[in-house]
Swiss-Prot record:
Subcellular location: Nucleus
GO cellular component terms attached to this protein's record: RNA polymerase II transcription regulator complex
UniProt-listed Pfam families: bZIP_1
Region (Basic motif): 97-120
Function: Putative transcription factor.
Annotated stretches, region: Leucine-zipper: 124-155
Record key words, sorted: DNA-binding, Nucleus, Transcription, Transcription regulation
Record domain bZIP: where: 96-159
UniProt protein name: Putative transcription factor kapC
Chain residue ranges for the region called Disordered: 1-102, 169-280
Bias kind Polar residues: ranges: 79-89
Biased composition, class Pro residues, residue ranges: 39-49, 197-206
Amino acid sequence: MQPALAPHPSAQDHADQVLHDQLLAAQHQHLTHPQQARPQPPAPQPPHMQPNTPARDQNNIDPAISGATMLTGPPQTPTQPDVTGQETPKTYGKRPLSTSKRAAQNRAAQRAFRQRKEAHIRELEGKVKAYESMGEAIKALQAENYQLREYIINLQSRLLDSQGEVPELPGNIDLSQPRSEIPVPPIPNSGTATTTAPPPTAPQQPQPSHAQAPTSNDDMNSLNRIAVAGLGMRKPPTEEANYLGNNFQAQARRVRPDEGQPEASELPKQEQTHGLPLIS
């Protein structure tokens, strides 16, 4: 039989080198990551995997190295999560998601803005239509107001004409008695004896006091014509012509008082031809 061979010295050197490298790696990891938790010690190797080294070889190992190795054990590199590999898909997945969400929010905001704008435009259009209708109503009221003003002015002029004061007749004059010198009004073409007074003008302002004399004379002439028409009396053509001339002059003075005509006080007194006595 051949004797058992002793272990080769290169195996011992290899084990020492491995332990030394593991110790240096553990120290470097501890310095670079002080806050990181200490990794769990590895499971003990089965006895058949351990090298068959005698006690004398183990005693030759540096005690500092052997103590650190026994305390820390063979370090294992902690499995750190692949930050780049995991964050890249998240970032790539979040960006399209956030962009699509932002786009949806922008579309919703634009839609709400368009709705508010359309509602505001409709409200303004309604106000414009209301203002236009109010303007038409105001114009109609103004036109009606002008018409009513003209109507009121016309009524006032007629009221002044109808309420003109007629002077009282003297006590010694009786219009019911026939007189030969009473003028006879002109007979119209239709053959009737009734005549109408000329249409009165529509004065906007009351006439002065000095212009009341021709008006009172005209009123007297109107009363005389009514009385004569009721009695059916006639006069010669000469007296009728004189009466017509005097009546035309009185009307001309009343219608055009401001066209260079003298006032009533400056006109020469003319003898009345109505047949009534003059009272001074």
